[in-house]
Amino acid sequence: MVSQHDTKLLHKDVANNEALDGTSLSKNQNTSSTALILEGGSYRGIFTAGVLDVLREKGVTNFESVWGTSAGAINSVSFKSKQIGRAMRIMLAFRDDPRFMSFRSLVTTGNIAGGEFMYKEIQNHLDPCDNEAFNSNPMQMYAVASDVTFGTPAYLHVKSLPDDIKMVQASASMPTVSRMVELDGHRYLDGGTTDSIPFAAALGLPDGQAEHPVVIPDHKPAKKALVIVTQDHDYVKTDMNEQIAIRSQFYTAYPYYEAALASRSERYMDQRKQLFELQNEGRVLVLEPPEPVEVKVNEKSGEALLSLYLTGRKVALDRLEEIKSFIE
C-alpha cells in the first residue's frame, strides 16, 4: 500500500502537469472573481439543482468559473447552459428507467449509471443540453475526476459540448460500479475519491492536510467561492464504501488509487473543516441542507427527490440577499 505522504507528493507533481488540467480562464470583464463549487453525491445533487435554479431565476450568475465533482459536474452542465429545471427534470423523469441508474445497467453495461443513455440519449435527444448556450457562456467549467494511475484529482476543463462530455462522465463514474473512462491516455473514475469539494483548487490553496497549494496551469485563482455541499453541517463520513472498493480488489494494480480510497474519509473531514474555517474568514460562503439527507444513491422515490429539490430552493431563497452581497 502506498503511504498517504507519497500520495501527497505525487499530487504535487501531477497537479503541475499541464496535460491534466486545462487552459486559461476567460478574461471577460463582466465576470466576478467568484468561483461556484458543487459537491457531488449521486441523487443528493437534486438539492444542488434546487439552489442553482433559484440562482439562475434571480439572475445570480456572475461567476468566473464553476467546479463540479461527480453529480456536481452534471449539475454544472445545465447551469452553464442556462437551462432552468433541466437537472431536476432528468433526475425525476428517469429515476425508474433501468437505463439511467440501476443494477441491471451495471450487469449489462458495466456501469450502474448507463453511459450511453445518460451522456448521449438524454444529453442529445430526450432532454437535450443547449450546447450553443453552453459554449457561448464565458463562465469556465471544470469537472473533477480521479486519475486512477496516480490517485490524484484531475481538473478537466470542459470547454465545449458535445465534444467534452466524456469529461463529465469521467467525473461521475463511481468506483466498483463503473468502468474507467479513458481520455488522452489517462484512466479516470469519480472525482469524489480525490477532491469531493474542489474549493481549494479554485482558490489556489492547499487542500486539507496537503503542504502545497493546488496549482492549475494558466488558471488565476478566484478570490472567493460560493460552495454548495450536499450533506448537512454535522455530517461525519465513514469509510464503508471505500473499504468495499478496496476489498473488491478491482484496483490492486493501482496502488496510489487504493491509497486515495483508504484515506478518503479522513481527507474529506479535513476538507470540510478547512471549508468552514474559510467561511469564518469570509473567503467562502457555504450553502448546505439544514437536516441530514436521507436519499439513497439510487433513490427511486419521486417524493423524496422532489422534497430535497424544494429544500435546495428554500435554502437559496432564504439566503438570497446574503449570496448577492457575498458575490458583489
What role is predicted for each listed range?
Residues 1-69, 77-328:
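Patatin-like phospholipase
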